[in-house]
Amino acid sequence: MGLWKSSPFLAFSILVLCQAGGLQAAPFRSALEGLPDPTALSEKEGRLLLAALVKAYVQRKNELEQEQEQETEGSSITAQKRSCNTATCVTHRLAGLLSRSGGVVKNNFVPTNVGSEAFGRRRRDLRA
């Protein structure tokens, strides 16, 4: 997977090396000076190689995206309630637990004032 993330860099590097090979001011002289260099690519061959690399990269990227979509469609994602630990939320959860519990506690249970306006900010009287 890491190879495909670096493929654009790899393709660009190959292109730069091909172009830089043709622009050398002082070419490397070897013992086989009379023979053509088998590693040198013509401009047309370089473009074909680059096009093939880009095409292979795009195909592989599309395949990976399709695999990821299929994995996410097949997985069962369950919704979970967000956890809240403020005093209001804890009080509300305790009140709910007490109201669901049976026995003596239920008979003597007096509901508490819980909710968004129970603690903290309260509505002001507009008459004053």
Swiss-Prot record:
GO terms for biological process: adenylate cyclase-activating G protein-coupled receptor signaling pathway; regulation of cytosolic calcium ion concentration. Residues 1-25 form the signal peptide. The keyword Secreted applies. Its main location: secreted. Pfam families: Calc_CGRP_IAPP (PF00214). The keyword Transcription does not apply. Residues 74-83 have a biased composition (Polar residues). Residues 63-83 are annotated as: Disordered. One of its GO terms (cellular component) is extracellular space. It is found in: Secreted. Disulfide bonds join 84-89. Keywords: Amidation, Cleavage on pair of basic residues, Disulfide bond, Hormone, Secreted, Signal. One of its GO terms (molecular function) is hormone activity. The modification Phenylalanine amide is found at residue 119. Residues 26-80, 125-128 form a propeptide. CGRP1/CALCA is a peptide hormone that induces vasodilation mediated by the CALCRL-RAMP1 receptor complex. Dilates a variety of vessels including the coronary, cerebral and systemic vasculature. Its abundance in the CNS also points toward a neurotransmitter or neuromodulator role. It also elevates platelet cAMP. CGRP1 can also bind and activate CALCR-RAMP1 (AMYR1) receptor complex. Belongs to the calcitonin family. This is Calcitonin gene-related peptide 1. It comes from Canis lupus familiaris (Dog). The gene is CALCA.
